[in-house]
Each structure stands twice: as C-alpha cells, then as structure tokens.
C-alpha cells in the first residue's frame, strides 16, 4: 500500500488562513505533505500535532521548505504497518528521523520517498550488526534492567564502532529481554506466565500518546505482549499504588473505580485475582462483596464504563474507570480469569466426549437436593447424563464436582452432538488464546476506525460540489426584501421551495416567506397552487382585474398540472369554465366573500345559463348576505334588462310585499336617514318661531314630498332630499324672525310694554315725537336681529339674569318710569342721599329697569350691573380722575368732532354720545333720539355679549347709520375695564371717561350706565334702555333749553377747560348738573323738567348740598382718590 505522506516540510513564515480550505500555521511548524499540485503553487498538507488534531488544508508553496532530518535510525525488527499513516520496514533498514517529539512513534523516511510513522522501540541509533551488547547485557545486574535495549549500543557506536557480526551471533530479540522480565515480573504476573514464548517482538505502543504516556512504559522490554500490555495500561492510567498487588494476595489486581447510580457516583475499589472478583465501596465499613468467577454472568465495556452482572446474589454494576484504556484492561483481566476457570470444565467435557454412552446436558433451572439420592445443580450448569432410561422423570447425572445423583428430567436439556461439543471446545480454546490480544486489537481497530472516519469526512468535504444549471439560475427574494440568493429551482414539496445555490449548497425555503413574484414563478414552472401562501394584503390592495388575472392564471395552472392526473377522471363540467369569483367582484361584493360564494355556485354545478333566472331567494339559499344579494340582483337587472319590479327580485323569502328591513318593494335600498332629517326640522326651536312669526318662510309642503322621493331608485334618493332640506332649513329666514321674535316676545311680555314711560312721555312730551321713536325702536331691532342670527345664544344666556335681577329692577324701575316725575325724584333722592353707595343701587335701578322692561329679558342683567354703575354716579369725581383724565375730555372732544352716529354705533358709546349731544345742545343729540340710541344699544349690547363685532350691530341699527362703528370699537374697550372695575364708584364717572360723554354730567348716570353697560355687556343695555326711555322724553323735549343748558354748560366747561381741570373742576360742576341729573332721571322724560327738575334740585340741596358741596367735592373726589389709595380693599379699590 502506498504511503500517505509525500514529504515533510517546515514553515518559513507565519500564515493565517483566508478561506475555509486553507491551513493556518506558524513559523518552523512541521507539515506533512498529502498531495502535490502541478497546476498551481498550493499544496495540501497536514499540520503536525497531537493525535486527534487533524488540521488539513492548503498551504502556499512559497511559505514552506523541505524539513531538515534530525538523525539517522535503524530498524531493529520487521514491522508491517497497521494504518495508512504508518510505514512498513524490515530489520536493518535505514530510517531518516524527521520528528521524534512522540516518545513512542517516530516520523521517518525510508528509501527517500516513503514517509510514515514507526514504533520508536522498533528502531535504534545503530544497525543491528553493530550491537554486541546483548551478550554482555545478560550478566548485568537487575538494577541495570530498566536501561533501554538500544542504550548499551549507543556509546559503543559513538566511541569505537565494531565491525559487523554475523546475524547468528546476535541472539534473537526475545531472548535478550526474557531474563530480566522473568526476574522482575514473575511474582506480579503469574497468571500470564503461560505462553510467554508465543511472541518475541516488543509490544506495539498506543498510537495516540504524548510525552507523559511513555513514562509508564517498561524500559526493559522483557516479558510477553500480554504482560507488557497490561502493565503498560495500568501504569499509564492508574496510580503507582494500583500497580502493586493487594496485601491479601500477590495475585490480586485492583483499580479505583466509581460506581454510577443514576446521577450519583460513589468511589469504590475493584479487585480481580485468585478466581475471585471483589467490590469494596470506599465508605462501607463492612466486608467487601465478592463473587467467584463462576458467578460472573456477563461483563462488557463501553468507552470508560464497565458493566458487570453477577449471581448469588444477583447484582449489576456500572463502573466508571476514568479512561478507556483502564476499562479495556479490566475487561482483559476478566477474560483471562474466566478462561482459566473454564479450562477445568473443558477437560471434563473432553473426557465426557471420549467416554462412550455418556451424554452432556445443561441444567435449565436450579434444583436443591431433598433426598439422599438427589444432587443439587445450578441453573446453566453442564452435567453428564449417566442414565436417562431407568426413569422418564428422574435422570442420573454427575455435576462438575463429580457428585452423582438424580434430578428431574424436565430440569435438564440434552446438549447437542459431539460436533457441537468440539465446536464449543474450539471456541473456548480460541477465546482463551485470543483474549489476551483483544484489548490491543480493539484499541488498534478504534484508531483505524477514527482515521477512516476522518479520511471519509475529509474526502467528502474536499469532493467538488455539483453546481446548478446556469440557465435556470435566478435571483430569489424573500417577502421582506432582506434575503436574496441566486439559485436554481429544484422543486416545491410540502410547502417548501427547494433551491440549488450557485455554490452548490441546496436549501429549502418556506413558501410563506418568499416574494409573490417568486411564488408565481414556482407556480408557472411546477404547476403547484401557492395561492394560500400569498399575502392577503395583495388581494385587498390589488385591482379586481389583477385578482381576476391571478385567479385565471391559477385556474389554468391547475388545469395544466392536473391534466395528466385527470386523464382517467371524468371531464370537467361546464361550470368550471365560468369565473364566478370575477362575477361577484364585478357585482361589488367584498373580495373575501367572493371566494366563498364562488365555491358555493361551483359546488352546486351552476353555470352562466342560470343567471337570468337567479332570484334573491336563490341567492339566500346559497348563503349570500342581504347586502350582497342586492348587489348581485342589481347587477343581473342591469345585465339582462330586468325591470326589478317582479317578485323574483323584490319579494323576500317570506313573501312580504312591503319590502324588507333595508329594501322597499322595488328592491332598492331604503334611505332611513331621511326621516331623521325631517324630524330634526320639526324639532328645531327656531323653526317653530319662524313658522309662527314668519309665515311666508314656512315650507312644510316640500317636507311632505319626501315619501315619494323614497320610492324613487336608489341613485336618485341622495339628490332629491338634499335639494329640499336646505330649502327647509333656510337658516337666515327663520333666524331673523327668531331674533326679532325673541326680542318681541320679551318686549311683548309687556307688563312693561304698556310702557308707562310711553304714557308719561306722551303727557310730558308731544306724542308725535314718541311715536316715531317707538316705531324706530321696534323696527331697528328687527333689522338688527336679522343680521345677528347667531346671537340667540346670547339672549338665552341673558334670560336667567333677567329673571333674577330684572324682576326686582323692573319692579323698582316701573314706578321710576311711570311716576318718573313723582317717583323719579324719590328714587334719585335716595340714590344721591346714599352717596356713592346709594346712587348705584337705587338710582340706576329705576332708570335702567324702565328701559329694560321694554327691552327683552336678556338685558336684565345690565340693570343689576347698571345699579352698581349708577352708584358710580355718586363717585363721579373718582371716575373723572381715572376715566375723565384718560378718556373723558379726550373722548368728549373726539365725540364732538366725530359724529354722534359713530359713537352710537360703538354701543356703550351710543349712550354716552347722545348725552354729550344733549349736554352740548348739539343738533346731533337732537337729531338722534335717545330711544333710538338705546334701542340700538340693546342690540349692540347683545352683540357685544355675544362677542360679535359692533360693526354688525351698527349695520343692524338702521337708525344709527350715521354713527360709525369706530368710536364704539375704540372707546368701549377702554371704558369697559375702567368702568367695570369702578362699578362701586359712580358709574357716571367711569362711563364718561371712556366714552367721552362724561362731560355731560346731567346725563352722567345714564351715560355712564351706558358706558358701563357696554363694559358689562348686559347691564349697560338695561341702563341704556331705561336711560333711552328717559332720554326719549329728553329728545322729545329737546326744545327745553333749561335742562339742556345745565348739561351744556358743564359739558362745555369741561371741554374748554384743560384736561387736568376736567379732572377736578368738571367733577364739581358735574355735581351741580349732577343734581340736575338726579332731577333729570326723574325728569328723564325732560318734559317734566319743570316739576321733577325742581324736585331733583331739592334732592341735591338735601344731600349733595350738605355733603357734596361744589367746593367740597373737589377736595373730596381728588383727595380721596389720591390720598386714600392705601386703604383700598377688594370692595373699595380706590379707598373711598
């Protein structure tokens, strides 16, 4: 057999493998060349190392060179290699040693071209002819026995080489090692003394071995292979104590073992010798267990474990010996012991075989003798049958001990013929003769098997892999796009696609992970249906045309793939030709339900010819949903021109002619939302007012026309009701009467509308003036309400305020308006007398309440707030300081410069500007009646409360078209804050300062109340209304100059005087007119100027003259505001 290695090389440099096929090595490493290449500069080599480290790979030729030889050796004996890595040689062959790192095996070269491993103890440094040492080695003392066989010749070879001797002069190798072995091991190995001369060469060392393995190998080489093999194994795997015989007997051999019991291991000692087997646990205090060799039923080994089965008593052991060699040694010892025991039985067998007429039998069951003529036998024991004819039930037998007796014949089985006995004897002989070599052969076979396995794996790994057909290679991608591979399709089995990659590796990928394009490719190539593995999102997102195309493709694929299998099957029925799936998709059915419906139609063998006859009842029987039934029926009606009025299409299963829950008698879907919309129109609160107050806007008949609209086809339903509903709603038309209606209703609630003010005004002033004023007042809110439709919420919000404070204010204000001449003075007197406190509560209450009664309840809150604001009239000096300084004089000038129309449009400005006009006597005040101003203020305040721009109010107020919205937008914001904070202080001053109407002190209370009402959004309206009512008489009595003069004088004075003077003096002067104001509120009818005015003066003389004199007022107002700020409180912010 050729050598495995082709050369030995040494590495010149370090090299790191770059691929799996390459080999990593370091400098000066030994490499065994396995293959030479003539095409490139890469060689296949094996890296030298311990056994089991078979590192094989490619190495670059430029990185290695032939390894130098270490020394020269010679073969001492003939040797035939056992594996392909070893080398066969003859005695005396010259060997070149390249690697001697292993003490038992050398890597050598023979003849310059054969490389391999050889046993180290089969070689020597000198040729066999040059070694005379064996003759001299015999008389050497025992102490020199451990010297190796080649050691005595080494110094002779170096110092004085001897001429070669004839071969017959050199004794045979076994004779050289026999004397020392006999003297040394005679006592330790008596059992193995037999047949020591069978083998002369030294034993084979273990192939895998390191530097430590050779330390325990005997150096003398004496003894036969059996003794040497056992001793070497023991010395290599056991401690030195284990090699020594036990103290009880020199023939016992012991090994430390571990008994395996489940997951536990217990230390113990196993001893074999003298025909006995003993087992002694380490922690046991009693006697060790022992069995004779005949009780050993079975023994075997597996790697490091030895299994023993005994009888008498029956016990089984699983022993762990630490290494496989130790386990083999124990098995070897047991085999020798069992062979020695069986040798005596074999002699008896031979004697029985040679004896005539005697048969051999085997005991099947254990039998204990109970009589004198009986004999005890054990199960499995061989006995001689002496007589089996005397009795059929009892046979005379003789056991192995020579004791004869009778045993039941059923307990004995006759042994086979003599041929069988001879075969048994031969087997026993062979077993005893070959058992000594079992361990050695087993280890050698294991090594050979391992090498063969490694070679096979290496060859399989190195074998070139098959490549796929380049024409079938394509790029495959998974569904996520992260995995891509170039491979050819092998097939699709069990939901997996088998691919052959370009590198030769074959893989299988689940169909559910592959992209849709790849699945379609597999379907086209293999004909396998993979629709279930495709994602559902594709079906949802794709168009119906794509889904039909995919379905048709799958149908064609199924038909093509099943053509061969369906050759013997009946021909497909015509129903399979019609695409029910596409039909339902065209009808608008959900894609998930299409397949289920298609399966039902196909299962019932329905084709396209039955479509004209399909009715809703047929569709229901096939499991279609109601909505899908309507879609399919509609599609069929359109396709075949059916009217859709027949019972087949419109009548449900139950035969209800009135239609179903969702469809009418015509089969069309019902518009259930139309009824709801109709009810919404009926329940609209504004619509009821529209119907009552705006008859021309009512459109009930169109609402009644909706039922016939429902009877129209489904397509016409959405348009018809949509056109009529906006006509019914007409938010603008109903809202206008709604707003005016709410105001009119509040006005017409009229405990107040009989308006004593109107009667008083008629008596006080010319009725002609009052009538146009009232007409304007009623008309203006109407127009204003039309523009302010969204302000209904404001009215609703004001209503609760009116209920609480209005009623009180109304009660208080009604007498103020009716007896405006008589009761007015009283009210004003209480207000003035109360000073600042009494004025806001009493004075303004009466004034705004009178106006508020006419005004809707929404402005009642203004009266309450107006009460506080008129209280500010008492503190007219305070407001003058803050408001008059900032806005009073300036605003007055602006108001004078700007037309009163603009100020009136401003809302609260409205009340203030007219007062300025009245005070100054300007034609503007006379031109625009106060009622109009107040009436406009009310809608404006409503709008203001609704936070709508005052511009809309101005637009709504036709009377004040001349008044621009600018003053209202500019001034009201500032006065609101100032006047609102100064509610407790007199509102006249606060309102006047922001609105510039403060100079009109005679109208201070109402004007300021108007300004405050603008700030308070609610109160100003009431006050303005009340004031407006009062002002109405003033306007009617515009010719009354005396009343206007007091207003004009202080107002002019305030205007003429510098701004600082307005702060001080105007307040003083204003108090003088303020007394007039008190009389004016009583005489707000101005027609009563004579009588109530006098009353007002008297009131002023009573309270103001004594406490609020003209001159004392200046220090009081200015001083209190400036000096008492330190004593300000939340209720008295200015420290009055």
Swiss-Prot record:
It comes from the Eukaryota. Residues 161-177 have a biased composition (Pro residues). GO terms for cellular component: actin cortical patch; endosome membrane; nucleus; plasma membrane. Residues 663-677, 787-810, 988-1011, 1096-1136 have a biased composition (Polar residues). Pfam families: PH_SLA1, SH3_1, SHD1. InterPro entries: PH_SLA1, SAM/pointed_sf, SH3-like_dom_sf, SH3_domain, SHD1, Sla1_SH3_1, Sla1_SH3_3. Residues 4-66, 68-128, 356-417 form the SH3 domain. Residues 533-545 have a biased composition (Basic and acidic residues). PROSITE patterns: SH3 (PS50002). GO terms for biological process: actin cortical patch assembly; endocytosis; regulation of actin filament polymerization. SUPFAM superfamilies: SH3-domain. The keyword tRNA processing does not apply. It is found in: Cell membrane; Endosome membrane; Cytoplasm, Cytoskeleton, Actin patch. GO terms for molecular function: actin binding; identical protein binding; protein-macromolecule adaptor activity; ubiquitin binding. Residues 216-251, 692-737, 775-786, 928-953, 962-987, 1024-1095 have a biased composition (Low complexity). The keyword Transmembrane helix does not apply. Residues 143-251, 423-475, 532-573, 640-739, 775-810, 928-1011, 1024-1136 are annotated as: Disordered. Its main location: membrane. It is a peripheral membrane protein. Belongs to the SLA1 family. Component of the PAN1 actin cytoskeleton-regulatory complex required for the internalization of endosomes during actin-coupled endocytosis. The complex links the site of endocytosis to the cell membrane-associated actin cytoskeleton. Mediates uptake of external molecules and vacuolar degradation of plasma membrane proteins. Plays a role in the proper organization of the cell membrane-associated actin cytoskeleton and promotes its destabilization. Component of the PAN1 actin cytoskeleton-regulatory complex. This is Actin cytoskeleton-regulatory complex protein SLA1. It comes from Yarrowia lipolytica (strain CLIB 122 / E 150). The lineage of its organism: Eukaryota, Fungi, Dikarya, Ascomycota, Saccharomycotina. The gene is SLA1.
């Amino acid at each position: 057999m050729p050598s495995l290695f082709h050369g030995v090389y040494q590495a010149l440099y370090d090299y790191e493998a770059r691929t799996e096929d390459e080999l990593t090595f370091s400098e000066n490493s030994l490499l065994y060349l396995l293959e030479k290449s003539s095409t490139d500069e890469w060689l296949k080599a094996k890296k030298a190392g311990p056994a089991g480290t078979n590192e094989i790979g490619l190495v670059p030729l430029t990185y290695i060179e032939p390894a130098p030889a270490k020394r020269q050796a010679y073969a001492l004996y003939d040797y035939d290699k056992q594996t392909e890595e070893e080398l066969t040689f003859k005695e005396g062959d010259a060997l070149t040693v390249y690697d001697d790192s292993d003490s038992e095996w050398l890597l050598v070269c023979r003849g310059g071209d054969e490389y391999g491993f050889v046993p180290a103890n089969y070689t020597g440094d000198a040729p066999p002819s040059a070694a005379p040492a064996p003759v001299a080695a015999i008389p050497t003392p025992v102490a020199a026995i451990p010297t190796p066989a080649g050691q005595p010749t080494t110094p002779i070879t170096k110092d004085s080489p001897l001429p070669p001797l004839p071969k017959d002069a050199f004794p045979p190798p076994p004779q050289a090692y026999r004397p020392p072995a006999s003297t040394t091991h005679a006592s330790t190995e008596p059992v193995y003394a037999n047949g020591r001369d069978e083998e002369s060469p030294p034993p084979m060392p273990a192939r895998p071995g390191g530097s430590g393995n050779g330390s325990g190998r005997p150096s003398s080489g004496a003894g036969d292979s059996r003794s040497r093999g056992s001793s070497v194994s023991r010395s290599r795997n056991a401690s030195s104590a284990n090699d020594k015989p036990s103290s009880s007997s020199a023939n016992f051999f012991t090994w430390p073992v571990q008994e395996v019991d489940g997951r536990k291991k217990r230390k113990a000692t196993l001893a074999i010798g003298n025909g006995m087997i003993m087992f002694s646990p380490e922690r046991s205090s009693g006697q060790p267990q022992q069995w004779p060799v005949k009780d050993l039923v079975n023994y075997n080994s597996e790697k490091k474990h030895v299994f023993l089965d005994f009888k008498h008593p029956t016990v089984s052991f699983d022993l762990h010996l630490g290494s496989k060699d130790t386990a083999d040694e124990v098995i070897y010892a047991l085999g020798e012991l069992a062979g020695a025991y069986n040798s005596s039985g074999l002699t008896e067998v031979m004697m029985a075989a040679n004896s005539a007429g005697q048969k051999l039998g085997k005991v099947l069951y254990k039998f204990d003798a109970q009589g004198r003529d009986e004999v005890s036998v054990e199960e499995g024991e061989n006995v001689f049958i002496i007589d089996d004819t005397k009795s059929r039930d009892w046979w005379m037998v003789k056991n192995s001990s020579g004791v004869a007796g009778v045993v039941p014949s059923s307990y004995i089985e006759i042994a086979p013929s003599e041929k069988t006995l001879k075969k048994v004897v031969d087997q026993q002989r062979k077993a005893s003769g070959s058992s000594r070599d079992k361990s050695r052969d087993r280890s050698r076979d294991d090594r050979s098997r391992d090498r063969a396995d490694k070679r096979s794996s290496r060859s399989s790994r190195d074998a070139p892999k098959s490549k796929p057909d380049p024409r079938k290679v394509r790029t495959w991608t998974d569904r996520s796009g992260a995995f891509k591979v170039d491979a050819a399709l092998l097939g699709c089995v069990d939901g997996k696609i088998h691919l052959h990659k370009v590198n030769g590796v074959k893989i299988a990928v689940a169909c559910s992970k592959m992209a849709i394009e790849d699945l379609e490719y597999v379907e086209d190539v293999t004909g396998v249906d993979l629709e279930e593995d495709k994602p559902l999102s594709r079906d949802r997102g794709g168009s119906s045309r794509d889904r039909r195309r995919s379905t048709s493709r799958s149908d064609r694929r199924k038909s093509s793939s099943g053509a061969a299998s369906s050759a013997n099957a009946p021909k497909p029925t015509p129903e399979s030709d019609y695409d029910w799936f596409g039909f339902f998709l065209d009808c608008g059915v959900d894609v998930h339900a299409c397949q289920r419906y298609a399966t039902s139609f196909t299962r019932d063998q329905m084709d396209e010819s039955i479509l004209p006859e399909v009715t809703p009842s047929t569709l229901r029987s096939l499991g279609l949903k109601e909505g899908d039934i309507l879609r399919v029926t509609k599609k069929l009606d359109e396709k075949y021109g059916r009217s859709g009025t027949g019972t087949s299409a419109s009548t449900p299963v139950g035969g209800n002619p009135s239609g179903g829950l969702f469809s009418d008698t015509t089969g069309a879907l019902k518009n259930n939302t139309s009824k709801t919309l109709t009810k919404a129109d009926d329940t609209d609160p504004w619509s009821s007012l529209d119907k009552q107050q705006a008859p021309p806007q009512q459109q009930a008949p169109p609402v009644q026309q909706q039922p016939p609209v429902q009877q129209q086809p489904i397509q016409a339903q959405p348009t018809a009701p949509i056109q009529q509903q906006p006509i019914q709603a007409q938010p603008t038309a109903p809202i206008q009467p709604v707003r005016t209606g709410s105001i009119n209703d509040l006005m017409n609630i009229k405990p107040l509308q009989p308006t004593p003010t109107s009667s008083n005004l008629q008596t006080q002033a010319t009725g002609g003036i009052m009538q146009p004023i009232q007409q304007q007042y009623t008309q203006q809110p109407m127009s204003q309400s039309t523009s302010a439709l969204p302000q209904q919420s404001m009215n609703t919000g004001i209503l609760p305020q009116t209920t609480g404070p209005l009623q009180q204010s109304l009660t208080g204000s009604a007498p103020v308006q009716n007896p405006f001449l008589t009761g007015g003075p009283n009210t004003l007197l209480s207000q003035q007398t109360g000073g600042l406190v009494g004025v806001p509560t009493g004075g303004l209450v009466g004034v705004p309440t009178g106006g508020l009664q006419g005004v809707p309840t929404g402005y009642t809150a203004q009266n309450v707030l107006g009460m506080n604001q008129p209280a500010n009239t008492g503190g007219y000096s305070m407001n003058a300081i803050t408001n008059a300084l900032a806005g009073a004089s300036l605003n007055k000038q602006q108001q004078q410069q700007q037309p009163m129309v603009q100020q009136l449009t401003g809302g609260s400005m409205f009340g203030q500007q007219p007062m300025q006009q009245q005070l100054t006597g300007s034609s503007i005040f006379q031109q625009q009646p106060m009622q109009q101003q107040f009436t406009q203020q009310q809608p404006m305040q409503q709008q203001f409360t609704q936070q709508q721009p005052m511009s809309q109010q101005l637009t709504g107020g036709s009377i004040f078209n001349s008044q621009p919205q600018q003053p209202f937008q500019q001034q009201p914001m500032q006065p609101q804050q100032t006047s609102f904070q100064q509610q407790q202080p007199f509102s006249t001053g606060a309102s006047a300062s922001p609105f510039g109407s403060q100079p009109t002190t005679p109208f201070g209370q109402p004007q300021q109340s108007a300004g405050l009402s603008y700030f308070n959004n609610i109160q100003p309206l009431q006050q303005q209304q009340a004031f407006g009512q009062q002002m109405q008489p003033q306007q009617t009595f515009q010719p009354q100059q005396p009343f206007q003069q007091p207003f004009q004088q202080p107002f002019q004075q305030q205007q003429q005087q510098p701004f600082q003077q307005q702060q001080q003096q105007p307040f003083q002067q204003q108090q003088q007119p303020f007394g007039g104001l008190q009389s004016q509120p009583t005489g707000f009818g101005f027609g009563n100027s004579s009588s109530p005015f006098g009353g007002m003066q008297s009131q002023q003389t009573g309270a103001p003259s004594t406490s609020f004199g003209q001159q004392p007022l200046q220090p009081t107002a200015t001083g209190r505001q400036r000096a008492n700020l330190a004593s300000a409180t939340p209720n008295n912010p200015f420290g009055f």
